[in-house]
Amino acid sequence: MEMTNAQRLILSNQYKMMTMLDPANAERYRRLQTIIERGYGLQMRELDREFGELKEETCRTIIDIMEMYHALHVSWSNLHDQQSIDERRVTFLGFDAATEARYLGYVRFMVNVEGRYTHFDAGTHGFNAQTPMWEKYQRMLNVWHACPRQYHLSANEINQIINA
């Protein structure tokens, strides 16, 4: 991340204020303040991750994925024979924290800050699927979008989607 000295000074002062305003995270803010003040290039790359960007299209796709899982669970709940499909298969797992951190961060933002999909179970890992999921979700979305009644899925349609 490239910053002028003036930008670094402003950010350093912000971290100094955050240290006073948020004592529970003071050590983290002091560390970031030191990195900014001294211009440690390698560590400043951490800020690139924190100040990253998700394009609108990506955000909409993630919401679409979450909506698909909502539809899967609602449809599963309405099945006469729920035993044929394990409920865990229609439960949203999230994204991989190691390789899909920005997607995972957006999911957490949507649930914890925006208050959407609060009925989703974050599990003990907070929507960290611990395996890359993006490509799997894309295949699932393609099948789901082809279904004529996306919120009234049959057991066969649910199986086609989750096995995509």
UniProtKB/Swiss-Prot annotation:
Spans through the membrane: none
Native species: Escherichia coli O127:H6 (strain E2348/69 / EPEC)
Family: Belongs to the UPF0304 family.
Gene: yfbU
Coiled coil regions, renumbered to chain: none
Annotated InterPro entries: UPF0304_YfbU (IPR005587), YfbU_alpha-helical_sf (IPR023146), YfbU_helix-hairpin_sf (IPR023145)
SUPFAM superfamilies: YfbU-like (SSF116960)
NCBIfam families: PRK05445.1
Name of the featured protein: UPF0304 protein YfbU
A Pfam family it matches: YfbU
